């Protein structure tokens, strides 16, 4: 039994020794490299030497863009490479050890920070280990979640696009000490933000159109002094407006259409029209308040959606004004307003023909003159001519008067047939006795006829003002409908032509994208 355990113990001891020897090589190398190493000193053999530092940005998630705070939140990996002559070794001296992992706090770092941050976090989120190669070159890939400042242009919101940037520079070193560069792969400079399709998470509100990168020199530095280099990574992003179209724009258009449709209510239903229009105004005000909570509080520009909502408010207010004017015209009467000939000609003849509206034909001019006489005459008005009576009285009264006259004539003829003298004397006596009664009857008939014709004239005047109100309501409906359609089309055509440029920088033909394979 003891003889069987001997080989196993020997193998276990050999494995432990080899592992300890491997760890000892890495520990020995780290101890040798860190001996007399000062991480605060720049890795330059001579004072005039410049340390080359290359940067590459990998975007894994565009988290959000807060318009009110004008802050872009991104999840990135920052790839930095530089060489430190103090960290060189010969792999043969350390049994072929080609890579050494060293805590980043133990080596010199170029102090690359995000200049345009908005939360006070300049550095990376995790100080992970650096990878050191035998030639002294260091590879560092720390992750970070940055909140960078992004100036928001709200002119075409929500059909807008934004140009945001992440600006990196060394916090302590100038161009005479370090040289910031963009990373290179296969001899090609990576002048763009790298996106790994497998690791990248698409944003639901923004679509990335361009992602170039550029080297810039600090323009604030004096010409005789060395400035600070900056590496700027740009993100040109286009908003996906579907959310705002479904939840704000479409409801506003439908609600405003309801305000347009109130013209189909009767002209005298002004109260109901105003009630519907004011309810629409309240709903539009709620949507305007929701938009105001989304966009930044700036006076540099007015958002496109705010312009459209304001336009809808103006249209709705005009509809309310139209309803009030139409109601005022429809309720007029001949006692309070006299209709001018021009108004009658335009609103009762010309416009109904143009608008294909059915309006009753106007009375002849003679009837109008006679009706005015009836309106202005006194209770003792007498019938002067048969033509005026025929024009003013209805057919039933004309038949009654003709029958009454024929009866009087027949009675007179019957009296005359009995004898000229007797008949004439009796006829004259009858006339004398009946004269006051006949006169009273005639005056009573005249009063009744005058009152009826005055009422008929009053009703005709009311109907004419009502017809004018109908025509005016139809004109206002067509005007508001045209204004609503033209304004809506014009505003959204402006949004249609607001597109991200085909190239990221005007005048620069380079696309700043990886060349196709």
Curated annotation (Swiss-Prot):
Q: Does the keyword Signal apply?
A: yes
Illness the protein is tied to: Multiple pterygium syndrome, lethal type: Multiple pterygia are found infrequently in children with arthrogryposis and in fetuses with fetal akinesia syndrome. In lethal multiple pterygium syndrome there is intrauterine growth retardation, multiple pterygia, and flexion contractures causing severe arthrogryposis and fetal akinesia. Subcutaneous edema can be severe, causing fetal hydrops with cystic hygroma and lung hypoplasia. Oligohydramnios and facial anomalies are frequent.
In the UniProt record, the gene name given for this protein reads CHRNG
**InterPro entries to which the protein is assigned, alphabetical:** Neur_chan_lig-bd (IPR006202), Neur_chan_lig-bd_sf (IPR036734), Neur_channel (IPR006201), Neuro-gated_channel_TM_sf (IPR036719), Neuro_actylchol_rec (IPR038050), Neurotrans-gated_channel_TM (IPR006029), Neurotransmitter_ion_chnl_CS (IPR018000), Nicotinic_acetylcholine_rcpt (IPR002394)
Q: Where in the cell is it found?
A: Postsynaptic cell membrane; Cell membrane
Q: Which Gene3D superfamilies match?
A: Neurotransmitter-gated ion-channel ligand-binding domain (2.70.170.10), Neurotransmitter-gated ion-channel transmembrane domain (1.20.58.390)
Instruction: Kindly provide the name given to this protein in its UniProt entry.
Output: Acetylcholine receptor subunit gamma
Query: Which one of the record's GO molecular function terms can you name?
Result: acetylcholine receptor activity
> What's the catalysed reaction?
K(+)(in) = K(+)(out); Na(+)(in) = Na(+)(out)
The stretches that face the Extracellular side, renumbered to this chain, are 23-240
């Amino acid at each position: 039994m003891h003889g069987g355990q001997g080989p196993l113990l020997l193998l276990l001891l050999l494995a432990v020794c080899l592992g300890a020897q491997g760890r000892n090589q890495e520990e020995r190398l780290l101890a040798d490299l860190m001996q007399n190493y000062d991480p605060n000193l720049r890795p330059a053999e001579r004072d005039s030497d410049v340390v080359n530092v290359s940067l590459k940005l990998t975007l894994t998630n565009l988290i959000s863009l807060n318009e009110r705070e004008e802050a872009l939140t991104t999840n990135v990996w920052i790839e930095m490479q530089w060489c430190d002559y103090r960290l060189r070794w010969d792999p043969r001296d350390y049994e072929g050890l080609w890579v050494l992992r060293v805590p980043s706090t133990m080596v010199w770092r170029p102090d690359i920070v995000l200049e345009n941050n908005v939360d006070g976090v300049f550095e990376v989120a995790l100080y992970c280990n650096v990878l050191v190669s035998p030639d002294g070159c260091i590879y560092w890939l720390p992750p970070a979640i940055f909140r960078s400042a992004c100036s928001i242009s709200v002119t075409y919101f929500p059909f807008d696009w934004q140009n945001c940037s992440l600006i990196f520079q060394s916090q302590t070193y100038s161009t005479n000490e370090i040289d910031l560069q963009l990373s290179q792969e296969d001899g090609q400079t990576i002048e763009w933000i790298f996106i790994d399709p497998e690791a990248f998470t698409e944003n639901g509100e923004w679509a990335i159109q361009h992602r170039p990168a550029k080297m810039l020199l600090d323009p604030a530095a004096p010409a005789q002094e060395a400035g600070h280099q900056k590496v700027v990574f740009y993100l040109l992003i286009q908003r996906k407006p579907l959310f705002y179209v479904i939840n704000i724009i479409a409801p506003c258009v439908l609600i405003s259409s309801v305000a347009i449709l109130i013209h189909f209510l009767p002209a005298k239903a002004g109260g109901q029209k105003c009630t519907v229009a004011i309810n629409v105004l309240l709903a539009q005000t709620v949507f305007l308040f929701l938009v105001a909570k989304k966009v930044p509080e700036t006076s540099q520009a007015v958002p496109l959606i705010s312009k459209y909502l304001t336009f809808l408010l103006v249209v709705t207010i005009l509809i309310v004004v139209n309803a009030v004017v139409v109601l005022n015209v429809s309720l007029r009467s001949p006692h309070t307003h006299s209709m001018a000939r021009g108004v009658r000609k335009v609103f009762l003849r010309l416009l109904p023909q143009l608008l294909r509206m059915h309006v009753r034909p106007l009375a002849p001019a003679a009837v109008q003159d006679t009706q005015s006489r009836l309106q202005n005459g006194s209770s003792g008005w007498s019938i002067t001519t048969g033509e005026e009576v025929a024009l003013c009285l209805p057919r039933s009264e004309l038949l009654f008067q003709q029958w009454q006259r024929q009866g009087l004539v027949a009675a007179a003829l019957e009296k005359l047939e009995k004898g000229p003298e007797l008949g004439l004397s009796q006829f004259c006596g009858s006339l004398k006795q009946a004269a006051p009664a006949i006169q009273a009857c005639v005056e009573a008939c005249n009063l009744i006829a005058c009152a009826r014709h005055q009422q008929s004239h009053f009703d005709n005047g009311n109907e004419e003002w009502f017809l004018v109100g109908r025509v005016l309501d139809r004109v206002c409906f067509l005007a508001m409908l045209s204004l609503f359609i033209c304004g809506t089309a014009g505003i959204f055509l402006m949004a249609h032509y607001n597109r991200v440029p085909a190239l990221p920088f005007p005048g620069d033909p380079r696309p700043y994208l990886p060349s196709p394979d």
